[in-house]
Regions:
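Membrane-embedded catalytic scaffold of the fatty acid hydroxylase/desaturase
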Residues: 6-147
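Feature marks short, highly hydrophobic, charge-poor N-terminal signal-anchor/signal peptide-like helices
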Residues: 1-3
Length: 147
């Protein structure tokens, strides 16, 4: 039971951070590189994902600022170190293949390709990482564009 609470607390933190990077100018600039690059060049998993590096330096900085460092801090504060390992498996092995592939649609359980790519088209929607729960809670979800 504790792991479920920790998981949802962590995904809430990532949701808040992801939503914030669309508002804070310097972070928005870094994050925009991710949106621009993935929309035109995403080829799925690559070896550099194992090192938590993306194809461009701004996109890598964005990943570390919005996900990697907050996950480490969250794990340190809560003492729940499994979150780092869970995140690493997701980010290094699955994220590019699942979140940026329009053919993958496992919604409503995960934020898969169709869900996340709506966010790339309309940055006012679908901020959730791993789960669309927080988008539904805060009414930032967009279901219709993923059909």
């Amino acid at each position: 039971m504790t792991e479920i609470v920790v998981f949802f607390a962590w995904t809430w933190c990532l949701y808040v951070i992801h939503r914030s990077v669309h508002v804070i100018p310097i972070l928005r600039e870094l994050h925009w590189d991710h949106h621009r690059y993935v929309n035109t060049h995403s080829t799925g998993w690559q070896w550099n994902n194992l090192l938590l590096f993306n194809d461009t330096w701004p996109s890598t900085a964005d990943l570390w600022i919005t996900e990697v460092i907050p996950t480490v801090i969250f794990s340190y504060i809560t003492g729940e170190w499994w979150v780092i390992w869970f995140y690493y498996v997701w980010a290094a092995l699955l994220q590019e293949t699942l979140e940026h592939n329009p053919k993958v649609n496992v919604y409503p359980w995960l934020t898969s390709g169709k869900w996340h790519l709506v966010h790339h088209k309309n940055t006012r929607n679908n901020y959730g990482v791993f789960t669309p729960l927080w988008d539904m809670v805060f009414r930032t979800h967009n279901f219709k564009d993923q059909q």
